[in-house]
Amino acid sequence: MNPTCKKRMGAIRLETMKVVAQEAIAPAIFELVLEGEMVEAMRAGQFLHLRVPDDAHLLRRPISISSIDKVKKQCHLIYRIEGAGTAIFSTLSQGDTLDVMGPQGNGFDLSDLDNQSQVLLVGGGIGVPPLLEVAKELHARGVKVVTVLGFANKDAVILETDLTQYGQVFVTTDDGSYGIKGNVSVVINDLDSQFDAVYSCGAPGMMKYINQRFYDHPRAYLSLESRMACGMGACDACVLKVPESETVSQRVCEDGPVFRTGTVVL
């Protein structure tokens, strides 16, 4: 057995979680509510590795956590149907169960931020959900939250109303069918504010822009999406290169999914 895999297996948490509810919130995008003891260990920016309840699909699917309720022991996951596995997830309803591994990943660093702090959240498409818990937790501390969201079109817009509870929200669409026409850079490049921290998640093009725009920022973070196989750091399916190194690499599942800008090659 790979020694990395063996090391991780002792720390993996597996649980059969109960489906509390599920609904479609946009075309091919669903919000799934799960309940279980694992919720107590969850942090903003982490993800769960879900087993498809079908013997034909062996690999788990990584789904980011959008919000956490430790009192109810419930978490919300928002995902897009990308293939047969996630299509099966969309058929689940109240009372069903899921085999869950997690919580996985490092999550966002929300330390040392208070009512004197101002943060920028940047999300695109299905990368928006992980930012909801960040906004909720920081708003509760009195942190000023500014959010910029990017979508392909009006039909793809999600979580705008939810995020507006926690601060100012700008929405952009590629075709101009809703909000500001263009991508998130149209808004961000015009913002005069200095931000104590930046948290982002989205498509590769957006992440490259954030990485360049805030390259030297001491607290700018990228939550990266990647295809995964084992989810334990053993298979090297989600490896990223490190700047100025031919030998050192980072794994999205184990070392991420959150990385500080300038620390990985995009």
Model-derived segments and their meaning:
Residues 21, 67, 171-173, 222-224, ...:
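Structural signal for conserved beta-strand scaffold positions within catalytic alpha/beta enzyme cores
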Residues 84-227:
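FNR/FR-type flavoprotein reductase catalytic core
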Residues 2-96:
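Ferredoxin-reductase
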